[in-house]
Design a protein with these regions (language model features):
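Short, Lys/Arg-rich, polar N-terminal cytosolic tail immediately upstream
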Residues: 1-26
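A structural signal for multi-pass alpha-helical bundles of membrane permease subunits
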Residues: 4, 9-13, 31-305
Length: 305
C-alpha cells in the first residue's frame, strides 16, 4: 500500500507543469558543465601568477632561477628587507612618493571630471557637441603618444628638476583628465532634472544643486571616478620612466620594481621584488573589495550616454 502511495506521489509530481517547466534539459546540463569547467580553468590561469608572486615573496632562497616551484623554506625576511635595507633601493621613499602623487592626482582628477561631466550633462551651449566629439576622439588614443611632447613642455618650464618633478607627474595625470567625462556624464543624465528644478525653486544656487542634490544621488559614479583616478598614477610606468629617469629619490613603486630586476640587483632583490609587488597590490585590492558594489553600479552609467 505504501509503495502504491509513493508511486502515485511521484507520478503526480512528474505530471505537475511546474516540475516539467523547471526541469533542466540534458543538453542544458551539459552546456552548464562545459561553461563552468571553462570558467574554472580561466580562474586558475588568472590566479596562478598571483599565487606564484606570493609564494616567491616568502621564499628564503635568493636569485630568480630555481629548478623547483615550492620554496625549500618560507620566511618574511623579504618583506622586512624592503623597509630596512635602503642603501641601494629605498622602497619606503618610493612608496611615499607614489602615495603622494596618487592622492593629489586623484583629488584633482575627481574634481575636474565631476565638474566637467555635470556641465556637459546639464548645460546647453554652443560647440557642445563638437567638444564632446573631440573629447571622444582624443580618448581613443593612448596617453603615451603625447609623452615626448609633454616631457619637453615640462622641461621648458623647469618642472623636470628637483622637487618639482612630483608636481610634473601630478600635472601629467590630472591636467587633461576633464576630457574623460563620458561615463560620469552618462550617470548624471540618469539623475532626474526635476530634482534640480525643485531645489532651485527652494532657493538653491547652481553649486548647491550640484553638491547637495546631484552628488548625494551619484555615490556610485563618484566612487568609480575616485578609483580610476587613483589607479592611473599608482600603476603608471611610462611617464615616470621618461620624466624621472635616473633620479632615484623621486622614483615611484612602478619604476622601483622595474629597477629591482636590473642585472646588478636581481640576485639579491628578486624575492624582495615579489614582496614589493604584493605590498603594492594590497591597497588596490582592499579598495576594490570595499567599494566593489558602488564601482559596478557606476560603470552602468555608461549605458545612457
Amino acid at each position: 500500500m505504501a509503495d502504491v502511495t509513493i508511486s502515485q506521489g511521484i507520478t503526480s509530481i512528474k505530471n505537475d507543469p511546474n516540475f516539467k517547466k523547471n526541469r533542466m534539459a540534458p543538453g542544458r546540463v551539459v552546456k552548464n558543465v562545459v561553461v563552468h569547467a571553462i570558467l574554472a580553468v580561466l580562474a586558475l590561469i588568472w590566479l596562478f601568477p598571483i599565487f606564484w608572486v606570493v609564494l616567491t615573496s616568502l621564499r628564503a632562497e635568493k636569485g630568480s632561477y630555481t629548478y623547483y616551484f615550492w620554496p625549500k623554506a618560507l620566511t618574511f625576511d623579504n618583506y622586512v628587507k624592503l623597509f630596512t635595507d635602503t642603501s641601494s633601493i629605498n622602497f619606503p621613499r618610493m612608496f611615499l612618493n607614489t602615495l603622494f602623487i596618487a592622492v593629489c592626482s586623484c583629488i584633482i582628477t575627481t574634481i575636474f571630471v565631476l565638474f566637467v561631466s555635470y556641465c556637459m550633462s546639464r548645460l546647453r551651449f554652443r560647440l557642445r557637441k563638437p567638444f564632446m566629439n573631440l573629447a571622444m576622439i582624443l580618448g581613443l588614443f593612448p596617453g603615451f603618444m603625447s609623452m615626448v611632447a609633454v616631457y619637453f613642455l615640462l622641461k621648458a618650464v623647469g618642472l623636470t628638476e628637483g622637487g618639482l618633478i612630483r608636481l610634473a607627474l601630478i600635472l601629467c595625470y590630472s591636467a587633461a583628465s576633464g576630457t574623460g567625462f563620458y561615463i560620469v556624464k552618462g550617470f548624471f543624465d540618469t539623475v532626474p532634472k526635476s530634482l534640480s528644478e525643485a531645489a532651485i525653486l527652494d532657493g538653491c544656487n547652481g553649486m548647491q544643486v550640484f553638491t547637495k542634490v546631484v552628488l548625494p544621488l551619484s555615490k556610485p559614479i563618484v566612487v568609480y571616478t575616485i578609483l580610476t583616478a587613483f589607479l592611473a598614477p599608482w600603476l603608471d610606468f611610462v611617464f615616470v620612466r621618461v620624466i624621472v629617469g635616473a633620479k632615484s629619490e623621486y622614483w615611484t613603486v612602478a619604476l622601483g620594481l622595474y629597477n629591482m630586476l636590473e642585472k646588478e640587483y636581481i640576485y639579491n632583490w628578486y624575492t624582495s621584488w615579489a614582496a614589493a609587488a604584493v605590498i603594492v597590490s594590497i591597497p588596490i585590492a582592499l579598495l576594490f573589495i570595499f567599494v566593489q558594489r558602488n564601482y559596478v553600479d557606476g560603470m552602468t552609467g555608461a549605458v545612457k550616454g
